[in-house]
């Protein structure tokens, strides 16, 4: 808090303290109505007199985008999202060193000058927008809801392969919704009027309202909810819900169903950056590049297997022709084939060729069968940790978006 702003809590304390009556000339705070807070402003003279009563020394206002040398990344502070984030970073040789679990800060020894801050996901997005964080790992649903299309946010990697879910609209299975199976069916129901709008409960007010508006719903009211939204229709508090869905089991167990066209957003974990930081803060672009390369190399290697085998042949070209005739042995850019040297009668001879090819783990057995069918033997299987490309396409895309 800057010195100048230090007077504000004292004024607020005077206004909001239950035991204190408002100073002369000041109005008491207005009550908060459903869904909308109404704010009344203090008259200039009254505000000035209240501030003078507190007496504060004038001080310089700190810049909103304060200079600092350390780069900050925000990570989820708790829950499964936090565990999966730390696990992914560890797999990329970016282990987070968190010495005191009571503290909100940590570091990554492999990346000097990078400071880790554990935050609530929505606070990560807000602090990226303000410039208090430079990078963050957070679900795309949270980025979309709290970022609200802000140009201050740049999605660096949009598919970190965990935290998968969808923001979806669900309706009751019975009653007036029994035959409602599409979004169009729901919009065309005659029940919704200006006097009796469709009542939607959601924790995603921005995305929910935007979705309903873009899909032609004219008579809709929104109720903010947080947790156990599935109970609202059964209790008569709402007609439908817009909530995060993973497997859909919770919806089914509460007699709700998704409808065609009702998916608002597909989401998973993403790496997000503050645009201003990428442009202005020293070290942010370089650290972003390193993290992106590590993440991309590891995620590309996930699910891929290196298969090595020996095969008799008269030449590397002949062996290559046999290997490439098999659909599952094409590799990333093609198989690598090299001679296997043996000593025969005191001379070096080549009778076998070694084949190295990357195949999807899910088709491993099929690949081994195909290798055997063309003469492969001594098959070795190696799990891959990283596959570094010449340059990740996401990095080129980021530079293009930044105009660099």
From Swiss-Prot:
GO terms for cellular component: chloroplast. Its EC number is 2.4.2.17. Pfam families: HisG, HisG_C. It catalyses: 1-(5-phospho-beta-D-ribosyl)-ATP + diphosphate = 5-phospho-alpha-D-ribose 1-diphosphate + ATP. The keyword Chloroplast applies. One of its GO terms (biological process) is L-histidine biosynthetic process. It comes from the Eukaryota. Its main location: plastid. It is an enzyme of class 2 (transferase). Its cofactor is Mg(2+). Gene3D superfamilies: 3.30.70.120, Periplasmic binding protein-like II. Residues 1-72 form a transit peptide. It is found in: Plastid, Chloroplast. Pathway: Amino-acid biosynthesis; L-histidine biosynthesis; L-histidine from 5-phospho-alpha-D-ribose 1-diphosphate: step 1/9. Keywords: Amino-acid biosynthesis, Chloroplast, Glycosyltransferase, Histidine biosynthesis, Plastid, Transferase, Transit peptide. One of its GO terms (molecular function) is ATP phosphoribosyltransferase activity. Feedback inhibited by histidine. The keyword Transmembrane helix does not apply. Catalyzes the condensation of ATP and 5-phosphoribose 1-diphosphate to form N'-(5'-phosphoribosyl)-ATP (PR-ATP). NCBIfam families: hisG, HisG_C-term. Belongs to the ATP phosphoribosyltransferase family. Long subfamily. This is ATP phosphoribosyltransferase, chloroplastic.
